[in-house]
Amino acid sequence: MFSNGHFHIDLDPDAYGDANKDPFIQDEDKLTIAELIPRILIERNSFLNVTEESLQEEIDNPRAEDEANNEVDVASELDIGDESVENGSILMATLAETSLDPVELFQKQKLDLSKSINSALNETSLSLDFVSLLISSVKPNLAKSTISPHLNKSVPLGSLNSDRLSNENDDDDRNKSVAPKETPKVGHGWKLESLHKVTSLFREASENLNEQVLKERRYWNMINSVLTNDEVLFKTRDPLNNARAIGVKYGYGDSGSNFHDKGLAILRKDTVTGEISFNPINYAHKLTSKVFRYIRIKILSEIDGDFMLTGQSLFENDFSSSKDQIINDIEKARFFLFEEDLFYQLTREAKTLINYNVSIISNKIIIEINNEIIEIESVVYDENNDDELNNYYQNINAYSSINNGKCQLILKFFKIMLCCYYKYNLKLKQKIPTSLTKWKQSNSHPLVLRPLLGNIRHELNLKNMQSIIDRLIAKFKESLECKLQVDKFANLEHRSENPFQKSIERPVSKFNIVLKSKRSAYLKIDLELTTNEIFVNLIINMNVIKFKCEDDFKNNFNGVNVLQINFNDFHEIEECLDWTLLNFVNG
């Protein structure tokens, strides 16, 4: 229907029938109450504003309202007609779209709406990222919570800044207020101030670099001095801050020691001076504060029924031989680690000698032998107590220090024997691994305390045996002629002249006794004093052979083996020898 050059379209729903009915067009007469009331609220607003007068007026003037609506439509169409050609084309496109199927039109408008929403969301996200990046230099925590993950990975925080720009009017007023002659001076002042700031910054940077260079030079010079001292360095992590560091091995693990403390330390760098400090770590790679201990030997002799101190070893070591303090610290830690390992090995051996007058009390090993007491004590090192280190209170007279040299020799013997044990372990590690070598590595015990105690007891056993023989010879001197020959340490006669061979082999000594009776019969008694692998047990092997005449004895012919027996007690062998000699005299 055309009117004034425009056309109107009226849609009659009944013309399509029920089969072709548009689902988006609803018949108001067929709406339910639940659907009708919301539409009325949308069109007429709330029921509170409905009055009888307004309803009557609406009923009386339906045409006036339609004409007003038509006038509004015409006015809007005239305004559209006055638009530009581009707006007219948009209007024609819109009219063309209205001629499409309603479902297609709805889907198209829905797609346009989603695009607009996505565009708005993108612009909002960009704006939020811009603001977040802008405030990141001032409030980084707040910016991290609002910035997008992609921008956070791509752009570092604080990289965007802002400044305040004044208006042109303010600049003009400021320029007018400043005198023309003062403007160059202000600019020169700013430039001069900037130059001073840059100069100071460069000077500070140069000083910092020089300090860093001096620190690094001092650090690496000290590292080089440690390396020049033939120390073993390795890379590690500092347990304090897990930073990379250089460590040093000051222990004896590579020399054959199996002590639990491997002797590892961190050479920590001082961030202020650049110097390195010596910081030991334990087997769990944790920092530890060590208490240094050293071994002291004492000898107490029995005098008038009381045991008095007659000898004490001296602490002989100087930890200031090098001009570098770090070298002195390493040598000091190495010395006390050796002392700690030595006392540990001595304690291991002493536990197996409890039945031989050896006892362990706290940090002290006590050995009772031959009316003397030998004390091996682990003493805390105090470098400020010179009186104790130099035995000032012990050396009060000559008699109280008569055994000082003996104590010093015992201490040196222990240290040398521990070095021999290291060498033995090192040879086992270098051999081809077999079941025997593995067993030896896990079951080997050092020979440090046992050789000393065994040889002391062996000397006492020789004296006791000599006294027994002397008593028996004196008892039968009227009936027998005696000839005695003593061969001490007979097992070492045909060996090399190694002074330590005596310390690692069980001692063996022999007594050869030849007795001649009045009937010219000869009795040969061979006594052998030895021990087992414990070094402290007494084993006496006795062999008795009888000859009828001197010729048989000299030719070692027709000898009769009278007795062959072993003893572990001097009282028993004395009785046996007494009976043997008595039987020989009477027979």
Curated annotation (Swiss-Prot):
The protein's assembly and partners: Component of the Mediator complex.
Keyword terms: Activator, Nucleus, Transcription, Transcription regulation
Gene this chain is encoded by: SRB4
Keyword DNA-binding: no
General function of this protein: Component of the Mediator complex, a coactivator involved in the regulated transcription of nearly all RNA polymerase II-dependent genes. Mediator functions as a bridge to convey information from gene-specific regulatory proteins to the basal RNA polymerase II transcription machinery. Mediator is recruited to promoters by direct interactions with regulatory proteins and serves as a scaffold for the assembly of a functional preinitiation complex with RNA polymerase II and the general transcription factors.
UniProt record similarity statement: Belongs to the Mediator complex subunit 17 family.
Compartments reported by the entry: Nucleus
Organism of this sequence: Scheffersomyces stipitis (strain ATCC 58785 / CBS 6054 / NBRC 10063 / NRRL Y-11545)
One term of GO molecular function: transcription coregulator activity
Upper taxonomic lineage: Eukaryota, Fungi, Dikarya, Ascomycota, Saccharomycotina
Chief location category: nucleus
Protein name: Mediator of RNA polymerase II transcription subunit 17
